[in-house]
Amino acid sequence: MKREQLGSRLGFIMLSAGCAIGCGNVWKFPWMCGQNGGGSFMLIYLLCLVILGIPALVLEFSIGRAAQTSPLFMYRKLEKPGQKWGIFGWFCLLGNIALMAFYTVVCGWVIYYFVQFLRGKNGSLGFSAMISSPSVNVFFLLVTVVIAFFILSFNLQGGLERVTKYMMSALLVLMLALAVHSLFLKGSGEGMTFYLKPDFSKIDGSVIVGAMNQAFFTLSTGMGGMAIFGSYIGKEHSLMGEAIHVITLDTLVAFLAGVIIFPACFTFNLEVNAGPSLLFDTMAAVFNNMSGGRIWGSLFFLFMVFAAMSTVLGVCENILAMIRELTGWSRPKGSVVCGTGVFLLALTTALGFSVFHFQPFAEGTTWLDFWDFIVSNNILPLGSLILALFCCNKFGWGWDNFIKESNTGKGLKVQSWMKPLFRFVLPIIIAFIYIYGMSTFNWR
């Protein structure tokens, strides 16, 4: 099966950034920044991106471009004779499927809110009522899956790349318009002070760990989510520069989300919390109290649809690519089968708040928490640790092969003095994040 290629460098950057940008950029990063020292937290976060995010992203792009296969076979393609790294390709497939088992439902929620604002039904919105409605959850899950796999059923350049370019461009325009509007609200000064004023007294060990976690998880490295796009590009540009472009775009979206949210929340004296309640309850209340709220609310949730759908498209492309390489199916056939499988598995989450109740951990947890635990607490950190060990050591692909691949082409290069960062610092920090996450997890 001939390997498809992206048509442009812009398409590659937009696709990679789109996969990284998601709901977490909106409901987690701004809240963490505001609660944990504002500008001082942002400085620590940016430092963590340099130490963690850029190296992890370069590793994923490199292994994908070198292997020219999906993540299912990339370890097998690059391992030395007699090695058994290939088994970790299945780890990548499991991670992507588990992510779509709940993220497609979240995307459906965003589409539902957008539709309700567009119809002028925003006054009756309620997050608890929505998630406890089996019909709403299942219908908008179906809408999400059908849209995603319909787009993916076309060829790479004519389907995914073209749609993502338009969608990401529209997302950035919408965010800029919403940010400018928020800065003219009467509570903008107070909101921006809460968001960005440096307060180093709030910086402690837990805040630094939080910054490391956010810098690491925002890029979703570790299960081939970025490697697949590396496999679709040529060798005209080195990969350090490409990683910086993607991270810059991802960080810009996260920053602008805070500019949109905090002035609005402080204008209408609404509590700022992390999690879905910030997005669905708080922001819906903001727009319901705002002049022209139906229009601004529709634009906000349209931007959120683009953010969520870009992640769904990126991850589903990864699943589709892996299954197609395993079976030899065409894009249309693979899209139908994979779409059906994702929909059926995601029903656990869609119905988990009502008829299909399951409490995996502490009281109040559901299927969504179970799938999130599989992905965020296990596959992402462990997958990234495996990737770092494989790429930078002789018992894997090896540092020389990695640096040769990452530095091929024009642009910024990985320098030889960075070897200890990639080979020792990165794996140690990832292992720490994993152990810390498991030790502080609320099991019961």
PLM feature spans:
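Loop-to-transmembrane helix boundary motifs in multi-pass membrane proteins
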Residues: Q5, G11-I13, C19, P134-F139, ...
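Helix-loop-helix connectors at the membrane interface of multi-pass transporters/channels
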Residues: R3, C107-S132, Y232-E236, G241, ...
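Transmembrane helix-boundary motif of multi-pass solute transporters/channels
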Residues: L10-C48, A227-G230, M240-I244, T248-T251, ...
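Hydrophobic alpha-helical segments of multi-pass membrane transport proteins
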Residues: M309-G314, S335-F353, D369-I403
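Membrane-embedded translocation segments of transport machinery
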Residues: K2-L6, L10, E161, K165-M309, ...
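Membrane-interface "cap" regions at the ends of multi-pass membrane proteins
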Residues: M1-K28, A56-F61, R65-L78, G82-I87, ...
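A generic transmembrane alpha-helix motif of multi-pass inner-membrane proteins
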Residues: F361, T366-C391, G411-R444
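Inter-helical loop and helix-membrane interface segments of multi-pass membrane transporters/permeases
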Residues: R3-E4, W31-N36, A66-F91, T104-G159, ...
